[in-house]
């Protein structure tokens, strides 16, 4: 049981290296942005959606309360974090249109953020049983 807290603010640069937005909790104003279609890339569509939005507004507003519970299933599309590395790389290569070298450097930043920075936002909660 963990509580994932959001950063106090979420600029594009921070989202570039890590998807901090839980897609089941993220909302955007359709009247302002219009309908944004998700990418045809099978995985990481949610990350690309929020990157598209933050390209327009630069910083997202964070709601500091928990809005949902997320259940991790063993065989879900995103269960294997190692398998997702190639999909994250595809975000840099295809979505951002970066060359191989720059995308590789971005993956180093991504891994640093995932392994060092993002765990700071995860808090263990005590069971109420």
Q: Language-model segments: what does each one mean?
A:
Residues 1-83:
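Conserved nucleotide-sugar donor-binding catalytic segment
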Residues 60, 66-67, 74-129:
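Non-catalytic, C-terminal membrane-associated alpha-helical segments of glycosyltransferases
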């Amino acid at each position: 049981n963990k509580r994932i807290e959001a950063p106090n603010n979420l600029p594009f640069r921070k989202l570039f290296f890590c998807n901090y937005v839980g897609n089941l909790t993220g909302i955007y104003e359709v009247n302002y942005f219009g309908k944004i279609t998700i990418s045809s890339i099978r995985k990481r569509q949610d990350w690309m959606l929020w990157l598209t939005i933050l390209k327009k507004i630069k910083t997202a507003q964070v709601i500091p309360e928990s809005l949902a519970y997320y259940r991790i299933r063993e065989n879900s599309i995103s269960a294997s974090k190692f398998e997702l590395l190639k999909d994250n790389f595809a975000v840099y290569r295809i979505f951002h249109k970066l060359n191989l070298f720059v995308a590789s450097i971005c993956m180093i930043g991504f891994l640093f953020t995932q392994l060092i920075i993002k765990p700071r936002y995860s808090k263990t909660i005590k069971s109420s049983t």
